[in-house]
């Protein structure tokens, strides 16, 4: 068994992209080559980061099993699948764990396991693409039903050919989006005090924006008189969304009386939503900062489900 600590193998962003680092990283060079390949294909940095951490967990498990990447078989992957189902780790109740006892979570949720298996499958498909003599050990299942060759024209012409699914996928229950009811949404919104936070919540609830989309907005992306916003979503795809008149008024008030003109160094940014106080005042609001804002207001309002995405889900439910 490899004697390895968490510091021997970890994930970091060196500026060139997400990669495994540490003394043990030399044993898993294939992973870093795969992550670089994803970056070259213009996968979003968040996707590359997620793959990096999923493969980090797999590589740490392999080290504990005294197994190299080149020795992985289908039987190895089945044992890892069992490990994901029975592993215990420190955590808190949430959608990513099955149960929790004495401060420790037991077993990853199906979505987490499937995401990890997708990363592993992609890794070995990448290896097989470079070296056809090294086939992927991931067992393939039946292909998903999609349009036949004769059907893939006209409106269906964009559909890809069916791809086989992995036999290692865990059955994943399909759940409806969990939004907030009217009382919960009102209680959460009433707890916000700053114009910035009210505008952010309004864009999520009434325009259906994701957290990342809100944070990526520039001042010029919002047309307040016409009530439109140009939003950059997943895959850098742009779309124009309507902005409620009340939310537009909140944004205008925020711009006039609350938004900082520059940071402590005098640097100016086009980002719409900025840090309001502290040493980072005037700098773009980060995902961590936004989560901290919502965490504070969940506690203040007593709406335990008041996460940023819950507001977007509330928008989806209301417009369904």
Give the location of each predicted region:
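Basic, Lys/Arg- and aromatic-enriched nucleic-acid-binding interface segment
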Residues: 172-211, 237
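Conserved tyrosine-mediated DNA breakage-rejoining catalytic core shared by Y-recombinases
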Residues: 207, 212, 216-250, 260, ...
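Basic, Lys/Arg-rich DNA-contacting stretches centered on the C-terminal catalytic core
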Residues: 101-105, 169-171, 191, 225-247, ...
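N-terminal core-binding DNA-recognition domain of tyrosine recombinases/integrases
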Residues: 32-46, 56-155, 187
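Active-site/catalytic core of tyrosine-dependent DNA strand-transfer enzymes
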Residues: 245-303
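Flexible interdomain linker/hinge and immediately adjacent N-terminus
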Residues: 78, 133-187, 232, 276-281
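Short, basic (Lys/Arg/His-rich) helix/loop patches that form interaction surfaces
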Residues: 241, 291-320
């Amino acid at each position: 068994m490899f004697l390895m600590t968490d510091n021997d193998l970890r994930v970091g962003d060196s500026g060139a992209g997400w990669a495994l680092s540490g003394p043990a990283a030399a044993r898993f060079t294939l992973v870093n080559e795969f992550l670089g390949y994803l970056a070259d294909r213009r996968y979003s940095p968040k996707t590359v980061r997620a793959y990096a951490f999923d493969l980090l967990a797999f590589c740490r498990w392999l080290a504990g099993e005294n197994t190299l990447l080149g020795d992985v078989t289908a039987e190895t992957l089945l044992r890892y699948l069992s490990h994901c189902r029975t592993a215990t780790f420190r955590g808190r109740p949430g959608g990513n764990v099955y149960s929790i006892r004495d401060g420790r979570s037991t077993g990853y949720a199906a979505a987490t396991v499937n995401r990890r298996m997708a990363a592993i499958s992609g890794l070995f498909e990448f290896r097989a693409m470079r070296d056809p003599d090294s086939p992927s050990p991931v067992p393939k299942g039946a292909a998903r039903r999609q349009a036949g060759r004769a059907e893939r024209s006209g409106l269906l012409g964009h559909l890809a050919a069916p791809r086989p699914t992995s036999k290692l996928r865990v059955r994943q229950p399909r759940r409806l989006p969990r939004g907030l009811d009217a009382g919960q949404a009102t209680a959460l919104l009433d707890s916000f005090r700053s114009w910035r936070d009210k505008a952010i919540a309004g864009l999520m609830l009434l325009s259906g924006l994701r957290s990342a989309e809100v944070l990526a907005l520039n001042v010029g992306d919002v047309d307040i008189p016409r009530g439109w916003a140009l939003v950059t979503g997943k895959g850098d795809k742009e779309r124009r969304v309507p902005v409620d008149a009340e939310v537009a008024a909140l944004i205008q008030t925020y711009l006039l009386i609350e938004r900082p003109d520059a940071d402590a160094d005098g640097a100016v940014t086009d980002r719409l939503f900025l840090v309001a106080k502290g040493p980072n005042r005037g700098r773009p609001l980060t995902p961590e900062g936004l989560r901290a804002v919502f965490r504070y207001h969940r506690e203040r309002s007593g709406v335990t489900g008041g996460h940023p995405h819950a507001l977007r889900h509330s928008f989806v439910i209301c417009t369904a």
